[in-house]
């Protein structure tokens, strides 16, 4: 079964908007696990506009499922993740000024750089996933870089799905199939929600993990976080 990793960045954004520690990010992560989530995802950025470095350390001590830390592999980021050693690091080529991640790596162009980063993380026994666009060439070069997994950027899928679900699925089939054929683990994330998640998993049942944050928090405003997580888990069965 595909695992659900809950991205809690939005919870940290809410906390930081008011100061103090409400909501408690670490408590929220633990509760997500209690409600069935099989992982917690965070994406600390240099300006700490949501997740802070201290959060990552606390989460490492408290999370009992899988901790996935996303980020651009700067020296500062690599120092953080090699210190805490999360279950998985997802390499994302985002600029510090970006509101959210909006493209994957050009793994062919940056092959040598990514190889070096992957080797560094593997030395600490950290599973490495590389965030890529749905392009089979990018998937192949992620494998050449030594990645354990790729995470397919599903922003375009979500956008297409609203207009033409079949077209959205077919646009991702070459990349998803390539990952499966190569024996490369495949994650997916960005703009997945209660409407578009199940068709994606039905089309690509070898998806190892989905990372979902924004939609889960939006749904939780109406359903509550416990029921929301159950709704997503039901779609992944």
In which residue ranges do the predicted regions lie?
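Conserved N-terminal beta1-alpha1 strand-loop-helix module at the mouth
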Residues: 1-70, 75-76, 80-86, 167
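Short beta-strand/loop segments at the ligand-binding rim of alpha/beta enzyme cores
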Residues: 1-4, 61-69, 117-130, 179-188
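Glycine-enriched alpha-helix->loop->beta-strand junction motifs that scaffold or abut catalytic
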Residues: 36-38, 62-64, 83-89, 123, ...
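Glycine-rich phosphate-binding active-site loops on the catalytic face of alpha/beta enzymes
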Residues: 43, 91-98, 149-161, 206-225
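N-terminal active-site wall of soluble small-molecule enzyme domains
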Residues: 44-119, 137-138, 152, 172-176
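C-terminal helical cap(s) of enzyme catalytic domains, especially alpha/beta-barrels
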Residues: 60, 103, 164-165, 219-237
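Catalytic cores of alpha/beta
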Residues: 75-84, 135-145, 188, 192-207
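Histidine/lysine/aspartate-rich catalytic loop segments that bind and position anionic ligands
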Residues: 127-179
């Amino acid at each position: 079964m595909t695992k659900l990793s809950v991205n809690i960045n939005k919870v940290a954004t809410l906390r930081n908007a008011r100061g103090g520690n409400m909501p408690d990010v670490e408590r929220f992560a633990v509760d997500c696990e209690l409600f069935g989530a099989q992982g917690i995802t965070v994406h600390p950025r240099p300006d700490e506009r949501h997740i802070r470095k201290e959060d990552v350390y606390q989460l490492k001590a408290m999370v009992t499922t899988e901790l996935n830390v996303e980020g651009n592999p700067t020296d500062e980021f690599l120092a953080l993740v090699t210190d805490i050693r999360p279950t998985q690091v997802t390499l994302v080529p985002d600029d510090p000024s970006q509101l959210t991640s909006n493209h994957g790596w050009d793994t062919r162009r940056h092959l040598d750089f990514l190889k070096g980063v992957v080797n560094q993380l593997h030395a600490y026994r950290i599973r490495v996933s590389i965030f890529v666009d749905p392009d089979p060439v990018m998937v192949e070069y992620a494998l050449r870089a030594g990645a354990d997994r790729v995470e397919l950027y599903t922003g375009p899928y979500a956008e297409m799905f609203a207009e033409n679900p079949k077209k959205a699925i077919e646009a991702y089939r070459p990349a998803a199939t390539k990952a499966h054929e190569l024996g490369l683990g495949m994650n997916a994330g960005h703009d997945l929600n209660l409407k578009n998640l199940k068709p994606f998993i039905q089309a690509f049942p070898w998806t190892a993990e989905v990372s979902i944050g924004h939609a889960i928090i939006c749904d939780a405003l109406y359903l509550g976080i416990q029921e929301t997580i159950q709704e997503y888990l039901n779609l992944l069965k």
